[in-house]
Design a protein with these regions (language model features):
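Extended cationic-aromatic binding surfaces that line active-site or macromolecule-binding grooves
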Residues: 1-22
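Bulky hydrophobic/aromatic packing residues
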Residues: 2, 6, 56, 99-101
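Residues in flexible loops and secondary-structure boundaries
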Residues: 5, 10, 27, 121-123, ...
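Structural motif
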Residues: 6-10, 51-59, 151-155
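Short secondary-structure capping/turn micro-motifs that flank functional sites
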Residues: 18-19, 35-36, 139-140, 166
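Alpha-helical ds-nucleic-acid-binding substructure associated with the helix-hairpin-helix region
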Residues: 20-92
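C-terminal accessory module of base-excision DNA glycosylases/AP lyases that mediates lesion recognition
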Residues: 58-70, 77-85, 90-174
Length: 174
């Protein structure tokens, strides 16, 4: 919920670290409010030795507070991946990519793929995905194609999408 269009990975990571340092990830008391999260996100972040401001602190604080409330109720325990993704996507700000990210990183599941613009473009260049497919509109179809491709080359989807993302990101930085 911290990342997305217009937020660089490094800034996202710094914001995540800030929330973790403040106890957001450990809290279970329900004491963390939208206002508290906003104040944490408004403080300048250290990114590669530079102070930067986080984009969209108000919107993200609202979304994180709502998500925090949902997780406090343990609403998602014991759900299968398909049901869990649907439940996650019912929360404002969570689309198929973020839901897949949560499922992958919280459950260690390889039943999902994290398809972002980097993976989309790379797979289109390799002719794995059709050129006319777009995110988020075609996410589920793209994910199925990616999972089939991953199985065909005998590479875990979690490894394949991470490697593609990393390599495309590095190539763009050059």
């Amino acid at each position: 919920l911290l990342g997305g269009f217009g937020i660089k990975y490094e800034v996202n990571f710094a914001a995540f670290d800030r929330l973790d340092e403040k106890g957001f990830l450990d809290a279970r008391s329900g004491s963390i409010t939208e206002e508290t999260i906003r104040s944490w996100l408004l403080e300048p972040l250290n990114v590669n030795g530079r102070e930067v401001r986080y984009r969209f602190p108000n919107q993200r604080a609202r979304r994180l507070a709502r998500m925090y409330g949902k997780f406090q109720r343990d609403e998602f325990e014991g759900l299968d991946v398909t049901t869990l993704r649907s439940s996650l996507m019912s929360v404002e700000g969570i689309g198929p990519k973020t839901a897949s990210w949560i499922i992958r990183n919280c459950l260690g599941s390889d039943e999902v793929a994290i398809i972002d613009v980097h993976v989309l473009r790379a797979c289109q260049k390799m002719k794995i995905f059709p050129e006319n497919f777009r995110l988020p509109r075609d996410y589920e179809a793209l994910e199925q194609m990616f999972l089939h491709f991953s199985a065909a080359i005998n590479v875990r989807p979690s490894v394949l999408d991470a490697v593609i993302w990393s390599e495309v990101r590095k190539a763009r930085a050059v």
